[in-house]
Swiss-Prot record:
UniProt xrefs under PANTHER family: PHOSPHATIDYLINOSITOL 4-KINASE TYPE 2-BETA, PHOSPHATIDYLINOSITOL 4-KINASE TYPE-II
Residue segments, region Catalytic loop: 322-330
Listed name of the protein: Phosphatidylinositol 4-kinase type 2-beta
Residue ranges, annotated region (Important for substrate binding): 174-176
Function comment: Contributes to the overall PI4-kinase activity of the cell. This contribution may be especially significant in plasma membrane, endosomal and Golgi compartments. The phosphorylation of phosphatidylinositol (PI) to PI4P is the first committed step in the generation of phosphatidylinositol 4,5-bisphosphate (PIP2), a precursor of the second messenger inositol 1,4,5-trisphosphate (InsP3).
């Protein structure tokens, strides 16, 4: 067991409380720089896929009969205004009867078109094309397949040819979601309610955490998280309650038997679910698999350096977002070398080609962005901290890549604003709680900045005193942040009951 670093070793205070009194962020004890669809049928008597969603509108005088919600209780805003799209960074347009009718007049949508109304990514057409293929597959009866592993409802999403192209994790089927199809967390809640959930995380924000981790990864230039965004999908293989399925069957029956009534429905089919969609990566294995092999058969020096560089990027990502669920089974390694299958002698020996590559994929980022440091039962440690790679000091390559960004406070402020635009789309968004999440992240960035400057190793990084960097009430709110009075720091000294370092 590694003992947690005591901030009292180098800071004033006795550490008996939860935190020391706030001090000005520019005190002498703090580093000088804080952060340096077309019509699908000729008539209304079309045959519908069981899991498809269809919106019907007779004319501009059609009556919108209802606005349904998906399993998570969130409104399914399926009729955007005349602008045509709803981006994560855009404010939600006021939905009046006039603009809802004008946007849907004389359109007979194909199955699944209602979820497609949300899934517009003009800034990333390649990702949008992948989502379109996923929607087409569902329309054609190639439904997502539930993943057996894990404690939540997550699904392999396929293209029309049946090839896996992504992993979809609906909000309503998260580990503590009310429509989670797996019983593990239900028994946890019933049998051990005192330990239910993670007290440092906001419930049911896993899908946002997944997408936000991808955003942080891109902003820092790490490129180890498969691209992840928030999308809306509907499929009969998702877990819906009995009422939603009964309503879907009733509406489809009414549409087929009584078209005049059926065409007045806002949507026919199951409601789309909001969740995170992460691109599927091929050729990767769990880290445990390769780490054991690398231990038995050491890598050549150039490959070892590549692995160390990729590992350090994983450390940077996990530390900044304070991932509370990083084991060696939810990050992946891909080792590429020529001649696989062609070696006839000494196949167990590693080759040393120039075009070989080791890559890491950081998946399962849904339990990150806590609003406080873990201080109750468990510490939720980073399991990579016990690997031999964690004992090696951060390389110059990593310092050159990351330090110039996180040392710039305006870069950090821009990152917080981008995360705000993403998180505010959630129905249960709380600005106060979000600011607490950002305070933890700023503290993590502060520690990482100092560790990179001091040439520390990942294991030394996780042993640094935990810091929360909060915006001062008197601090400015503009984009250009002044260091003098913008933030204050607090050392978080309360330890979890079970500590890991």
């Amino acid at each position: 067991m590694m003992a947690e670093c005591d901030p009292t070793d180098g800071e004033p205070g006795n550490g008996s409380g939860d935190s020391t009194p706030e001090t000005n962020f520019l005190s002498s004890e703090v580093p000088a720089v804080l952060f340096e669809k077309t019509r699908s049928a000729p008539s209304l008597g079309l045959s519908l896929n069981p899991g498809a969603a269809v919106r019907i509108s007779d004319s501009t005088e059609s009556v919108l009969t209802e606005l349904e919600a998906d399993g998570s209780g969130e409104e399914a805003l399926l009729l955007p205004g005349p602008a045509g799209s709803l981006s994560p960074r855009a404010g939600k347009e006021k939905r009046t009867r006039r603009n809802m009718l004008s946007s849907s007049s004389d359109n007979l949508a194909s199955p699944g078109n209602s979820s497609g109304e949300f899934n517009h990514f003009p800034e990333d057409p390649e990702f949008g094309e992948i989502i379109q293929r996923a929607e087409q597959a569902i329309e054609n009866g190639v439904f997502p397949e539930r993943i057996s592993q894990g404690s939540s409802g997550s699904y392999f999403v396929k293209d029309p040819k049946g090839k896996i192209i992504g992993v979809f994790k609906p909000k309503s089927e998260e580990p503590y979601g009310h429509l989670n199809p797996k019983w593990t967390k239900y028994f946890h809640k019933v049998c051990c309610p005192c330990c239910f959930g993670r007290g440092c995380l906001i419930p049911n924000q896993g899908y946002l955490s997944e997408a936000a981790a991808s955003l942080v990864d891109q902003k820092l230039g790490l490129w180890i998280v498969p691209k992840t965004k928030v999308v809306h999908l509907a499929s009969e293989t998702f877990h819906y309650n009995a009422i939603d399925r009964a309503k879907s069957r009733g509406k489809k029956y009414a549409l087929e038997k009584v078209p005049k009534v059926g065409r007045r429905f806002h949507r026919v089919g199951l409601p789309p679910k909001v969740g995170s969609f992460q691109l599927f990566v091929e050729g990767y294995h769990e880290a445990d698999f390769w780490l054991r092999k690398f231990e038995a058969e050491p890598l050549p020096e150039n490959m070892r350096k590549q692995l160390q560089s990729q590992f350090e990027r994983l450390v940077v990502l996990d530390y900044v977002i304070r991932n509370t669920d990083r084991g060696n089974d939810n990050w992946l390694i891909k080792y590429e070398k020529p001649g696989d299958g062609e070696l006839t002698e000494k196949e167990s020996e590693w080759t040393d080609p120039k075009d070989s590559a080791i890559k890491i994929a950081a998946i399962d980022n849904g339990l990150a962005f806590p609003f406080k440091h873990p201080d109750e039962w468990r510490a939720y440690p980073f399991h990579w901290a016990w690997l031999p790679q964690a004992k090696v000091a951060f390389s110059q390559e990593t310092r050159d890549l990351v330090l110039s960004r996180i040392s710039d406070m305006n870069f950090v402020q821009d990152l917080c604003e981008d995360l705000y635009e993403m998180f505010r789309t959630d129905k249960g968004f709380d600005k106060t709680m979000f600011e607490k999440q950002m305070s933890v992240m700023r503290g993590q960035i502060l520690n990482l900045t100092q560790a990179l400057k001091d040439g520390k190793s990942p294991i030394q990084l996780v042993q640094m005193p935990r810091v929360v960097v909060e915006r001062s009430r008197s601090g400015g709110q503009g984009r250009v942040v002044q260091l003098g009075n913008a933030f204050t720091q607090t050392f978080h000294c309360k330890r979890p009951f079970f500590t890991s370092w």
